[in-house]
Amino acid sequence: MRLPVIDLFAGAGGLSVGATDAGCDVRASVELDSTACKSLEKNARYHGVVAQADVSTLSGRELRNLAGLGADDPLVIVGGAPCQPFSKAAYWVENGEEARFRRARAEGRDSIKPRTKLEARPDERRNLVMEFWRLIEESNPDGFVFENVPSIRHPKNRPVLDAFINSAQKAGYYVTETLGKAVEHGVAQKRERVFLLGSKRKRPMAPSPTHSLKHDECGELKPVLTTGEALEGLDDARYFEPEEVVTGRWADHLREVPPGGNYKAHTAWAGHPNPTFVTETRFWNFLLKLDPQKPSWTLAASPGPWTGPFHWNSRRLRTVEMAALQ
């Protein structure tokens, strides 16, 4: 019998894919976004119930009923509450203080690092972490997997994570907190995520890396996958998309950026004879270009028109390429 799983905040089903690959039976997914629900329903590998719903309106009993499970049937719950309240943008120093500090440092001027306030910005979505816990408490699964961005560990966000962990431990769960790095598990992308692994039987063990940037020093570990390897064959004309063509204000600048570089290639700091930009005046991923010899940076969910990473051939990434890097 395969272990039943319920996926909360399911999105397009990333954790469901992982659970399925691990031999589990994903019985149900709960997701609020209608487009994501359609993606779940069209996934040929997925055969569970898709519920378009706000998790805060559901009970633990309703979750088990949705998955066709009785009160005492084995169950694991997985999910990642919305990350936006915990992302770097949510705790970055405001009013440009951080940018001024970094610019002064880059120019060799004396500067004092601004102090951040430890109060988090108001965002109701922060409460969804404990809604995830509430559903665990009410449905009483054998274990759980919770996922979020690394910055949920930031001092402004840590109390939310600790409240979850403390509640789980008081309820009898062994909890392991770990930082997962996609690049260490055969993915050509330097995406990192915090995971809480919970079990009522014994303390869960975090999976060991299979790949390493220092593979020559790590015995049996494989070398990390590069973007060039992951995207091999996808630069073919049959995969062309009109949206990949870059036009507009910074198109010529993008073409001059070397692989692995960003807008700083057009600064005096980088030795450009006719600099357009001053270093530390743009976000680091502005005009950012992939290096085919290295893993990709994390792909942004909703990038702006000049937000990278761009392909090293000075175009936007194609859908099949973004999928290959995920």
Q: Residue locations for each model-derived region?
A:
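Short, solvent-exposed loop/turn segments at secondary-structure boundaries
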Residues: 155-158, 311-313
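Core alpha/beta nucleotide-donor-binding catalytic domains of modification enzymes
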Residues: 2-140, 150-153, 159-161
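Conserved beta-strand signature within the Rossmann-like core of class I S-adenosyl-L-methionine
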Residues: 142-146
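C-terminal target-recognition/interaction regions appended to catalytic cores
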Residues: 245-326
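Conserved S-adenosyl-L-methionine
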Residues: 150, 173-184
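Conserved Class I S-adenosyl-L-methionine
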Residues: 161-175
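Conserved hydrophobic/aromatic beta-strand scaffold that supports enzyme active sites
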Residues: 78, 177-179, 195-197, 298
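Flexible, glycine-/basic-rich loop-and-beta segments that form/coincide
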Residues: 186-245
